[in-house]
Regions:
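Conserved beta-strand core positions
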Residues: 29, 67-69, 109, 135
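Periplasmic OmpA-like peptidoglycan-binding domain that tethers envelope proteins to the cell wall
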Residues: 74-142
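Periplasmic peptidoglycan-binding/anchoring modules of Gram-negative envelope and division proteins
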Residues: 13-24, 38-72, 100-101, 137-142
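Bacterial Sec signal peptide processing site at the extreme N-terminus
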Residues: 1-18
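Short beta-strand/turn micro-motifs at beta-sheet edges
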Residues: 19-21, 25-28, 124-126
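Early exported N-terminus immediately downstream of N-terminal targeting peptides
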Residues: 31-37
Length: 142
């Protein structure tokens, strides 16, 4: 007996998302990489441990038939809006490239450079700025 998908997702897909650390938001299921994929100031290089995490997530998503994602890149508040939007787009692209290496189709990955919008921490402290240099992988349920 198959259960009815919640907003288009099956119970198996939801279980896989939860097991990878995704949380449900108003936009869908989100894996926030602020504590797992932190970018250095003015950088868009993904570290090896973070690369492995993203690749594992990509393989898990594909295994349960979740073939498309949105990747949002973010920055801290230092720098101009234009520069931060470009830098955040590069961060999203780097994560998208790792998902492609894991087997996802590039055309199925939307990347968004959100700049300094939607901070998760206080930009007035070094720790807060570090947490805001992040990427989020979102599975839309709309």
């Amino acid at each position: 007996c198959q259960t009815t998908p919640v907003h288009g997702l099956t119970a198996e897909q939801i279980a896989a998302l939860k097991s990878e650390g995704f949380t449900q938001t108003e936009d869908g299921w989100e894996f926030g990489l602020s504590d797992k994929v932190l970018f250095d100031t003015d950088e868009f290089v993904i570290h090896d441990a973070a690369r492995q995490t993203v690749a594992r997530i990509g393989r898990t998503l594909l295994k349960v038939g979740l073939n498309s994602v949105s990747v949002y890149g973010y920055t801290d508040s230092v720098g101009s809006d234009t520069y931060n939007e470009q830098l955040s787009a590069r961060r999203a692209d780097v994560v998208a490239n790792v998902l492609v290496e894991a087997g996802m189709q590039r055309a199925a990955i939307q990347t968004i450079g959100a700049g300094k919008r939607n901070p998760v921490a206080d930009n007035s402290t070094a720790t807060g700025r570090a947490q805001n240099r992040r990427v989020a992988i979102v599975i839309s349920t709309r």
